[in-house]
């Protein structure tokens, strides 16, 4: 990836749909973060994935590579979080927009036009009688509005009324834009 970062072109938007330096940097950051956290949480000798060659310095190096790659992207001041000012709908719109070429958050995308270039996601989700849905684990992973885990008395109180635990006034607003809320069609 370092070679790709060195040789790819610099772009200031994603309209070309081509890989560029910042896409490679983002991929490097994601891989380095995954590797760092994997190694950090599997370094106990009784862990099935334990590797004695992985040192704390190596783990630190992965974290540092992740931070450096992210910093390189951020410091260019080209990309920014997509926002129309409506935090209760922006996340949903990010995934419902047909043309992402002018979205300042999107580094790289594939254009779908429905008539000529699409996907078979509905077919994949419905094979075998299943459907699109989310797991309890996914819902539980969303933090509260103040950034803390959703645990304890808060959970019990919210689960008394179906759907209350999904409310954007209680949880990260992205949760209510990821799952169907009671009353939504």
Regions found by a protein language model. Give the residues of each.
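An aromatic- and glycine-enriched ligand-binding surface/loop that stacks and positions planar moieties
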Residues: 18-22, 30-185
